[in-house]
From Swiss-Prot:
It is found in: Plastid, Chloroplast. One of its GO terms (cellular component) is ribonucleoprotein complex. Disulfide bonds: none annotated. Pfam families: Ribosomal_L20. Belongs to the bacterial ribosomal protein bL20 family. Keywords: Chloroplast, Plastid, Ribonucleoprotein, Ribosomal protein, RNA-binding, rRNA-binding. HAMAP family: Ribosomal_bL20. Its main location: plastid. Binds directly to 23S ribosomal RNA and is necessary for the in vitro assembly process of the 50S ribosomal subunit. It is not involved in the protein synthesizing functions of that subunit. One of its GO terms (molecular function) is structural constituent of ribosome. One of its GO terms (biological process) is translation. This is Large ribosomal subunit protein bL20c.
Length: 119
């Protein structure tokens, strides 16, 4: 069997990982083994945080809505219940943006819901 020299291939593979780790601190950007571990961990963290971002934004929208609705004397869960009862289909993102950017329209929406549900 003939001998296969993999020097160039192995070097390219290692160099690819090290190039990905530019900007990492300490040995994570210099030593291959440490760099490879940090690179794998960064991919894992990126995957987790892409999914956590959705959760965090939903939490933010709900807390913004809750604070806006409490100014009118309701809480978030009652507000969402009345929205569904009224047949208004607006998601939490749009509602929270309305409450921040255009409070007047948000108040009109609230009064419309209140009149429909007879608070």
């Amino acid at each position: 069997m003939t001998r296969v020299k993999r020097g160039i291939i192995a070097r390219k593979r290692r160099q690819k990982i090290l190039n990905m780790n530019k900007g990492f601190r300490g040995a994570a950007s210099v030593l291959f083994r440490t760099a490879n571990q940090r690179y794998m961990k960064s991919l894992r963290s990126a995957y987790e945080n892409r999914h956590n971002k959705k959760r965090n934004f939903r939490k933010l929208w709900i807390s913004r809505l809750n604070s806006a609705v409490r100014l009118n004397g309701l809480n978030y869960s009652q507000f969402v219940y009345m929205l569904k009862k009224s047949g208004i289909i607006l998601n939490r993102k749009i509602l929270s943006q309305l409450s921040i950017c255009d409070p007047q329209i948000f108040h009109e929406l609230y009064s419309y819901i209140a009149s429909k549900n007879l608070i």
